[in-house]
């Protein structure tokens, strides 16, 4: 009887251990399926972005662009108009306020120059060149949405009286070089976005319904993604000694 009891006890332990291992395996499989599903969902949304959110984005002839997604236009007066490029505008979407720099302020390339706000969120943009702020676009202070209507003309944010124009222009991109750089930035954003979790139900509905992502992707994502975007795309370190 003792031998039978021992055998039954061993069998019971084996069965119990098998059940535990099976349960753990199923749990790991469900977790893996969830993670894989999220990655697929993120990738599926990301695949839409270059085709839709960045559709029609280009850099006009004669416009210089900087790594921090600002643009520079040379004026006949010798001053430069500076603004926020169309890539950044399309990613950020709605703009509730434009923080204009102070006239007379001297800035160096890479220092904060202006900012835009969306609700409680803020995105700082750095100066693409050295100079003194000679004027600002007061219209954007009253109507910030106007910045999106004509980004490279009426959407200028401030004018600088440049101090190291020849040197700074060598650090910017123009024409084919600017277009090639912009293509790389679109690809980089796709990779960046693919790693972000979908937090917004609204974005999920857009995806499920086969909707077109026409811009303003950050409006539908969390604050962490906003801060990561501004850090990785707008606050990139720029060379100052080329």
Question: Which role fits each region the language model picked out?
Answer:
Residues 1-242:
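Contiguous, well-folded functional domains in the mature portion of proteins
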């Amino acid at each position: 009887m003792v031998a039978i009891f021992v055998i039954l006890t061993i069998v019971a332990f084996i069965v119990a251990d098998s059940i535990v291992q099976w349960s753990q395996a199923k749990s790991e499989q469900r977790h893996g399926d969830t993670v894989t599903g999220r990655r697929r969902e993120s990738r599926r949304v990301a695949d839409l972005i270059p085709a839709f959110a960045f559709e029609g984005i280009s850099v006009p002839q004669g416009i210089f662009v900087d790594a921090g997604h600002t643009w520079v236009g040379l004026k006949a007066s010798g001053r430069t108009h500076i603004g926020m490029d169309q890539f950044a505008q399309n990613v950020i979407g709605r703009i509730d306020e434009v923080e204009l720099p102070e006239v007379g302020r001297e800035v160096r390339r890479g220092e904060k120059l202006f900012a835009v706000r969306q609700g409680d969120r803020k995105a700082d943009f750095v100066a693409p060149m050295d100079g003194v702020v000679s004027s600002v676009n007061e219209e954007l202070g009253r109507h910030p949405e106007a910045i999106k209507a004509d980004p490279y003309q009426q959407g200028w944010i401030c004018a600088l009286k440049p101090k190291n124009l020849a040197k700074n222009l060598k650090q910017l991109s123009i024409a084919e070089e600017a277009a090639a750089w912009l293509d790389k930035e679109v690809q980089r954003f796709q990779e960046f976005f693919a790693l972000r979790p979908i937090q917004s139900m609204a974005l999920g509905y857009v995806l499920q319904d086969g909707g077109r992502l026409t811009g303003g992707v950050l409006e539908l994502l969390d604050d962490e993604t906003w801060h990561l975007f501004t850090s990785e795309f707008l606050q990139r370190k720029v060379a100052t000694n080329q």
